[in-house]
């Protein structure tokens, strides 16, 4: 179920700077970055208690504004969804305010968005990479990043020392991967790291 039909109208009545955003599924608005936190706080107060997703759009080099941050929020009591989009004003160093103060779950969403797009979330309590390693020089979801990737030297990190755990972590680069092509069960046939090719029905290999 989407947001009530008058949700967008009510929001624009309180925030005249908000404009309609074309959308084929959810009610959606565009919000100036200077007002995005005020709008998100208002939605939270109106019952949108869950940040379902936070992502970004890279409109490619030469576009201005180049980056748009998109929030998908849900009022769980009503089953009502709403979409908010805001443009980053600085194309060279895109930034928006952090929404962690409104929805604590925004923490990892914003870290992923920073990791993949290089967008800074100002006021985030721990803004660092979440998928790639510290020091990785690229932002893989930017339009200029090639589909085939860029060959990069992996850092020689002592995982146990860094994570302070005795658990042997999977290889940072993944693999070596193995697959059981003769398996009828798709789960069993799925390629996986060799040292993790075990489950509750199949003993861990020595």
Model-derived regions, located:
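Terminal low-complexity/charged segments
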Residues: 1-206
